[in-house]
Every structure is written in structure tokens, then in C-alpha cells.
């Protein structure tokens, strides 16, 4: 698998997990819908091969979750998000 496929797989796993999440807060649920839209935009950029080299940066998925305690408390979700951002930062410095 190439870097594009691996990265797309990680983002797809995040989306799949989001679909299984049961949250108590309506505000968090609404935010998660927007978050998923952003993840979908990233997947499209990967599929179109228009995603930029990371140059050591991250996609911001960790930051997008860190403001919501309910999302941070979900260990599986946190692991998926940090795994993706770390992979992009470290492995996708050039495609």
C-alpha cells in the first residue's frame, strides 16, 4: 500500500468510528457532523492526489477533538485521530 492508501484508510476508519459513537451532548454531536465533513474533504483530496506534503505539520484532527472533553474521553477515537495525525506528520512529508 502506498501513503495515499494508508492515509485514506486511517481517515475512513475515523469516519466509520464516528458513525458508531453515542454522545450525550447535542452540541458535541453537531460538532462531530462538521468534523466528519472535514474528514470527508480530506479523503477527497487524497483520492484526487491534491493533498499537500506534510512538511512535518499535522492535519489538525487532534486539535479538532481536544476542545471537547466527551471526544477526548473516548480512548478508541483518540487513538484513531492521533494515529492519523502522527502518520501524516511523519510519513507524508513527501508523496
Feature-to-residue mapping (PLM):
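Residue-level detector of solvent-exposed, low-hydrophobicity positions
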Residues: 11, 24, 38, 42-45, ...
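Amphipathic alpha-helical interaction modules
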Residues: 15-64
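Short terminal alpha-helical segments
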Residues: 1-31, 85, 89-92
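Amphipathic alpha-helical binding modules
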Residues: 57-95
Amino acid at each position: 500500500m502506498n501513503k495515499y492508501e494508508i492515509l485514506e484508510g486511517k481517515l475512513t476508519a475515523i469516519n466509520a468510528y464516528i458513525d458508531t459513537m453515542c454522545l450525550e451532548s447535542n452540541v458535541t454531536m453537531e460538532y462531530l457532523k462538521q468534523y466528519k465533513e472535514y474528514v470527508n474533504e480530506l479523503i477527497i483530496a487524497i483520492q484526487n492526489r491534491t493533498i499537500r506534503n506534510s512538511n512535518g505539520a499535522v492535519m489538525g484532527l487532534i486539535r479538532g477533538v481536544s476542545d471537547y472533553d466527551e471526544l477526548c474521553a473516548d480512548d478508541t477515537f483518540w487513538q484513531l485521530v492521533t494515529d492519523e495525525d502522527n502518520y501524516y506528520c511523519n510519513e507524508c512529508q513527501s508523496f
